[in-house]
Amino acid sequence: MAPAFKLAVAFIAICAVLSSACGGRGGTNSSGEAAVIKIDGSSTVFPITEAVAEEFQTEKRGAVNVTVGISGTGGGFKKFVRGEIDVADASRPILTEEMAQAKANGIEYIELPIAFDALTVVVNPQNDWVTSMTVAELKKVWEPDAQGKITHWNQIRPEWPKEKIALFGAGADSGTFDYFTEAICGKPKASRGDYTASEDDNVLVQGVEGNKFALGYIPYAYFAPHSARMKAVAIEWEKNKVQGAILPSPENVLAGTYNPLSRPLFIYVSRKSMDKPAVKEFVDFYLKHVATLAKEVKYLPLPETAYQMAMTRVSSLQTGTGFGGVPEVGLPVEEILKRPPKA
């Protein structure tokens, strides 16, 4: 055998070994192409999932491609119950109608709380009259009957300016919208419609920053890095276990005193997708690292016991939801995980 031919044969053999080794990394499919994990949903949960996805893809060295979209919690669930994505990011629990659609389409799901958020009521930094508001005052502003009627600051408190309120809030497909309206107005989606709405929280940040008479609500993770551009309003709730107005902060959320605007955040994983090795690895990686990564993007990790319970739910492939198809205000996340899930 000629030396050149021997060298070529050896080179081909080495390439075959290397190709086999690369193809054997978790996640790649039988053709050797990178596996794809499709995620969509909440803009609130997006920063956490994006951070986890980046770390996971780095670890997998190109063997897995994770796509993370933002279409709002409702938009993400629409895709999820049609079987179009593997994971749905959600800033509120799955609703009754979404549960019904999933069942009709044969979609089973694993519900996993992954972090806490504090919905933050914000005003412009030039606003020198508002430091706190009661839940009753917020309801007066945001309930459906307020549309076209409660339009000026002095209608909330007589001593406040007779200036028109510029309202900014979440769009109707947002889980933030569902939770805020449930917590403040008493019913999901019960809201006035004459305000600037967006599923993109950065749009709301810019709107409040640009108007001295603005009032809005956004997730804490979008407030924290922009706290010089807007001011958080302390919230007073007559049902709270402490008296007085409470500002949103990691300490107050973990202490259980920032109510009713503290909430758990979720990912929903398709049971069918869990049969894909890449998805199973990603979900395990998510629960292992989310506590650290959530803090990096200004969210609040759950207690360690909650993550352990979530891991048990994954390992046993326990499907269904711990909720009754509606958001529940002020509920400890451990209680959610202890409930028998239902489809």
Q: Residue spans of the language-model regions?
A:
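C-terminal motif of bacterial Sec signal peptides marking the signal peptidase cleavage site
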Residues: 17-21
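Bacterial N-terminal signal peptides that target proteins for export
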Residues: 1-9
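Flexible loop/hinge segments at secondary-structure junctions
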Residues: 22-343
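Short, linear, compositionally biased motifs with a strong N-terminal bias
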Residues: 11-14
